[in-house]
């Protein structure tokens, strides 16, 4: 039986760019403390001293309200802006500080200290690969189109609401992989075999599994008290689709306790697919 949340803690992700780096690292660390309820604040593009001072005001307000020090993850390059943030009543966890100095010492060259470089669009081919992959994922979502499956790097399959769409989008956005996804319906499962449109692309298929209890909860958000969201229906579909995975020799993964990031990384590992970007 899981423990209940113990208390709430304010967290700030601060950056002179998109804040994606600070947020990604911060969430990975915070996930190790499931009994703490975190109140997340994302502060991107903090590039001036004025903006930094405004953030300090917000941090201090949270400290007064919560009665404990907020946690601050930042990827600020400008030392003047960083010094201002460090005056806040908070626990400052500078993502770059320490790492940059160690790299500078090892590489024998000073850093550029250019702000916002992490996600700058500097390589047009890199950018195009990302955008093309995202467009492909959107155009080939949920079995809407199947005629371009020959161009897919990967085709995710699973029952309805098992995480196919968000995983497809993440793989395309983060790694530039062309991903289609196809839901196996009750009719497909009754046949106890892959639909014809998928059989010719068997080598590209990867299955998602999820525990019945979790699937019930997800489906109930859309259609509460329906047959679609009932435990018996979810259990029946999951047993049937796992049988297809096994009989057809399709690799699959139970994603119940996994984040999208974990799911995507495991899929790359299990399939041997190479990222096009990142």
Swiss-Prot record:
Its EC number is 2.7.11.33, 2.7.4.28. GO terms for molecular function: ADP binding; ATP binding; phosphotransferase activity, phosphate group as acceptor; protein serine/threonine kinase activity. It catalyses: [pyruvate, water dikinase] + ADP = [pyruvate, water dikinase]-phosphate + AMP + H(+); [pyruvate, water dikinase]-phosphate + phosphate + H(+) = [pyruvate, water dikinase] + diphosphate. Coiled coil: none annotated. Keywords: Kinase, Nucleotide-binding, Serine/threonine-protein kinase, Transferase. It holds the Pfam family Kinase-PPPase. It comes from the Bacteria. ADP binds at residues 158-165. The keyword Transferase applies. The keyword Lyase does not apply. Bifunctional serine/threonine kinase and phosphorylase involved in the regulation of the phosphoenolpyruvate synthase (PEPS) by catalyzing its phosphorylation/dephosphorylation. Belongs to the pyruvate, phosphate/water dikinase regulatory protein family. PSRP subfamily. This is Putative phosphoenolpyruvate synthase regulatory protein. It comes from Acinetobacter baumannii (strain ATCC 17978 / DSM 105126 / CIP 53.77 / LMG 1025 / NCDC KC755 / 5377).
């Amino acid at each position: 039986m899981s423990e209940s949340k113990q208390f709430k803690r304010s967290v700030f992700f601060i950056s002179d760019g998109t804040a994606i780096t600070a947020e990604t690292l911060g969430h990975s660390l915070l996930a190790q403390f499931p009994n703490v309820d975190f109140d997340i604040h994302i502060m991107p593009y903090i590039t001036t001293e004025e903006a930094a001072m405004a953030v300090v005001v917000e941090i201090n307000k949270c400290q007064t309200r919560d009665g404990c020090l907020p946690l601050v993850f930042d990827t600020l390059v400008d030392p003047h802006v960083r010094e201002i943030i460090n005056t806040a009543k908070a626990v400052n966890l500078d993502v770059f500080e320490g790492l940059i100095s160690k790299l500078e010492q090892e590489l024998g060259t000073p850093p550029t200290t250019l702000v916002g470089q992490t996600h700058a669009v500097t390589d047009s081919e890199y950018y195009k690969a990302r955008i093309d992959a995202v467009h492909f994922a959107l155009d080939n979502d949920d079995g809407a189109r199947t005629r371009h499956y020959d161009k897919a790097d990967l085709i995710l399959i699973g029952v309805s609401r098992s995480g196919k769409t968000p995983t497809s989008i993440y793989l395309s956005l983060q790694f530039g992989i062309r991903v289609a996804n196809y839901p196996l319906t009750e009719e497909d499962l009754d046949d106890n075999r892959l639909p014809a449109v998928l059989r010719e692309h068997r080598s590209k298929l990867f299955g998602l599994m999820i525990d019945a209890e979790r699937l019930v909860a997800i489906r109930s958000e859309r259609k509460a008290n329906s047959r679609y969201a009932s435990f018996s229906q979810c259990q029946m579909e999951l047993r049937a689709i796992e049988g297809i995975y096994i009989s057809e020799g399709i690799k699959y993964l139970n994603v119940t306790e996994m984040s999208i990031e974990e799911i995507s990384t495991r899929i790359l590992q299990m399939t041997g697919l190479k990222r096009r970007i990142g």
